[in-house]
């Protein structure tokens, strides 16, 4: 995940949820790189007021008190996030199992997802985060943060997992 913060108010919280623009520049395998397969870079909508405040507070960029509104205005509507979405390989250690210890209200077993990032995917993420930083720098972001993998996001694990015993 890469986020660029800009001096100018962009109104980046306006627009559709999810991916607004995406790039497939790095989607195919490039044999000159250290990883196989590729990833998309997705331009997302900026955060709304609550997420902006919580995120700025988390990174110690926002203080509650006398100058809160001015300080908040320095953050709100001024950021553009990019998501790096990798194409994993199916791997035996990733799997979906029935979870008999956690049942639903009808007594049916729940689902347990066992997933671990491969070294190849870690290399892809690293490459994507670097490209995202370059994009934000070229776009004129005054500050850039990168982090990942982001745990509670839209991971699509079915294609990388195995269900069953055979």
Label each region the model flagged.
Residues 77-88, 93, 108-166:
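A glycine-rich dinucleotide-binding beta-alpha-beta segment and adjacent secondary-structure elements
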Residues 1-78:
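Mid-to-C-terminal "cap/lid" subdomains and adjacent gly/pro-rich loops that border
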């Amino acid at each position: 995940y890469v986020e660029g913060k800009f001096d100018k108010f962009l109104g980046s919280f306006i627009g559709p949820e999810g991916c607004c623009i995406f790039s497939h520049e790095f989607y195919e395998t490039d044999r000159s790189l250290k990883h196989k397969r590729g990833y998309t870079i997705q331009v997302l909508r900026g955060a709304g007021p609550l997420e902006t405040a919580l995120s700025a507070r988390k990174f110690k960029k926002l203080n509650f008190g006398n100058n809160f509104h001015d300080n908040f205005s320095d953050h709100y509507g001024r950021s553009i996030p990019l998501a790096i979405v990798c194409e994993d390989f199916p791997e035996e250690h990733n799997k979906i199992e029935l979870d008999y210890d956690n049942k639903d209200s009808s007594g049916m077993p729940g689902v347990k997802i066992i997933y671990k990032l491969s070294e190849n995917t870690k290399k892809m993420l690293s490459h994507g985060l670097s490209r995202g930083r370059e994009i934000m720098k070229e776009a004129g972001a005054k500050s850039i943060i990168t982090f990942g993998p982001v745990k509670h996001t839209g991971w699509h694990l079915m294609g990388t997992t195995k269900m069953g015993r055979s």
